[in-house]
């Protein structure tokens, strides 16, 4: 994001790395030949798969002949999304690294060896010249298999706080790209988050009329987007369902993406609001998030890394509600935007119908404040991260051919 959007190292692996001089100097792009074959390892969640596919598209644009193979599992989103995008997918067993002593921990060595062997076979079959890992279950086996074969490794970390797989990967390579400044990985360089083309190229103002018409909204009314991602967010759904009548009566129209199977009929009447109030449109899933962003003046959402970066790239004011689980990475993902007064952040437990009425409704009706937030957000956004990460891949490939 900052320039200038379904794992076993020691704890010291996320400490700051060696002095900058240990990192190879970037090669001039004219001297950095792109790889002929790349294996992209990552999957499980959209947070890993989306940047993987964005990089794949960028590499293919640069060289239509490059061979690209994604490495994932049969159970992750990649099993559907990668083939749909036209790329080959090789699968390996899913290996979960237990955080506490358990029977699963006793089985880990054998399971990890099987996954590394399967990853190695995929690298050999692809003739991989570079392996790019995005974290998640498949990245650790891919990193270990690549290291054993002396194949250059590139790591991309999406979150402000790195996961275990990428802590391991960063110990094995100097080619480490991060989304956020300050991510504690060795050799880290900020490249941003590779975004899907329809988001990276979005002109919200130019698409606003089309987008609002697509959702059945009024052309000029204040517009709020509420989304908890593809799985939805029960806290957001409950709070906004309870305040739907107030939003509609105040003239604030809403696109509410609830998650599959979590739709509701707002109190205003039909799914698009009552005749007298502003529309309240409830949908389970938005397959055109570019249009949802273009239609909105404000979004209330979780602060996953991909979402934070998409919102910043398109300059959309946001109220972030970090998911209150994991290692707290969602709070850290939004930290830079919060510090710049480009967005608001609220704890999950505070999100209630009363909070929507007292905080979100006045903000949605304050165009001057939203304009200031939009400007601050856009100033921190980055749209060229796919190219920056592809440059890092080219560097690694050139180093491997020296």
Q: What function would you assign to each model-found segment?
A:
Residues 3, 28, 382-402:
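C-terminal alpha-helical cap of glycosyltransferases
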């Amino acid at each position: 994001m900052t320039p200038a959007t379904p794992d076993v190292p020691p704890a010291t692996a996320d400490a700051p790395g060696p002095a900058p001089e240990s990192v190879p100097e970037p090669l001039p792009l004219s001297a950095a030949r792109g790889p002929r074959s790349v294996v992209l390892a990552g999957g499980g969640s959209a947070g890993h798969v989306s940047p993987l596919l964005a990089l794949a598209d960028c590499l293919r644009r640069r060289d239509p002949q490059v061979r690209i193979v994604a490495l994932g599992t049969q159970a992750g989103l990649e099993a559907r999304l990668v083939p749909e995008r036209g790329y080959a997918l090789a699968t390996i067993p899913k290996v979960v690294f237990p955080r506490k002593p358990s029977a699963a921990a006793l089985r880990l060595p054998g399971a990890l060896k099987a996954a590394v062997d399967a990853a190695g076979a995929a690298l050999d079959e692809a003739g991989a010249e570079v392996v790019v890992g995005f974290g998640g279950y498949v990245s650790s086996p891919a990193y270990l298999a690549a290291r054993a074969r002396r194949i250059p490794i590139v790591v991309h970390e999406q979150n402000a706080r790195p996961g275990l797989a990428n802590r391991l990967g960063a110990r094995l390579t100097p080619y480490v790209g991060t989304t956020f400044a300050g991510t504690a990985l060795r050799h880290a360089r900020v490249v941003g988050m590779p975004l899907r083309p329809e988001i990276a190229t979005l002109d919200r103002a130019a698409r606003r009329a089309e987008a609002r018409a697509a959702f059945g909204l009024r052309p000029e009314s204040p517009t709020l987007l509420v989304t908890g991602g593809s799985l939805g967010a029960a806290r957001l759904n409950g709070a906004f369902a309870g305040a739907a009548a107030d939003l509609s009566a105040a003239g604030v129209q809403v696109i509410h993406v609830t998650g599959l199977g979590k739709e509701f009929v707002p109190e205003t009447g039909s799914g698009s609001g009552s005749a007298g109030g502003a529309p309240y449109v409830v949908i389970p899933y938005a397959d055109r998030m570019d249009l949802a962003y273009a239609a909105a003046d404000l979004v209330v959402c979780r602060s996953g890394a991909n979402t934070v970066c998409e919102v910043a790239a398109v300059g959309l004011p946001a109220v972030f509600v970090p998911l209150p689980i994991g290692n707290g990475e969602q709070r850290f993902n939004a930290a830079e935007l919060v510090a710049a007064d480009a967005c608001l952040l609220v704890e999950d437990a505070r999100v209630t119908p009363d909070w929507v009425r007292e905080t979100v409704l006045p903000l949605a009706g304050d165009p001057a404040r939203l304009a200031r937030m939009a400007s601050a957000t856009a100033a921190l956004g980055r749209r060229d991260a796919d190219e920056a990460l592809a440059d890092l891949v080219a560097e690694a490939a050139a180093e491997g051919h020296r």
